[in-house]
């Protein structure tokens, strides 16, 4: 499946293949496009290849013995596959890793400053104040060791640290993981504000399909290293297959039990 490229697409991933340890093929000809200034959702179950896709874009595959063996990643008209991560960050791409990867033994403010290591020091104060505007809890705890914060606060810190880099494209990997529904709603609302106020393009990887599609303009669904469905977010939310297998709803609008949903691999109509 080939992604449709328009003049507004700032990121194009075309026919991408990724192999780990020279033997394990994880991405199998994946293609997608991200429109500038929008939030795009990338959905799928565990093991579908979502995180690998983000790492292929951000250049972090090499640290895990991964390699792009075919296809291309083009950002703002320039190929970036094969470029080292620091150069990719300098081009305006920043990834927030799954699992709240923060420095637990230093303070909140010191964590934030680490996010701005590619920026001029003259920007630090202004950038930190901007982060505190979006995340007031971080301002309240700026002198606290990050390891003593709650899971939701640590996720806010991870996103805030990314904002310190002044990204043009923000890659978010499972920001809702392990968080209570109210915190998920709060964090997604803040991400939406950052997108609108700062003009930051967002590629959002999630298993929480409803939350992700509710803030996105477009979405892609992955299975087994391939894109199996794509479209505008609203059309995906209204799609019976997506409702049944990713939102837990039956065709009559009834909640599906896990026992029903777990059979979806044998029944996915979009794979034929």
Predicted regions and their residues:
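Helix-to-loop junction immediately C-terminal to a conserved catalytic motif
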Residues: 58
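ABC ATPase C-loop
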Residues: 162-163
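Helical segment within the ABC ATPase nucleotide-binding domain
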Residues: 185-199
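ABC ATPase nucleotide-binding domains
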Residues: 249-272
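The feature captures the beta-strand-to-loop junction immediately N-terminal to the Walker
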Residues: 43-45
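Conserved ABC transporter NBD signature motif
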Residues: 68-78, 124-126
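Conserved catalytic motifs of ABC-family nucleotide-binding domains
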Residues: 166
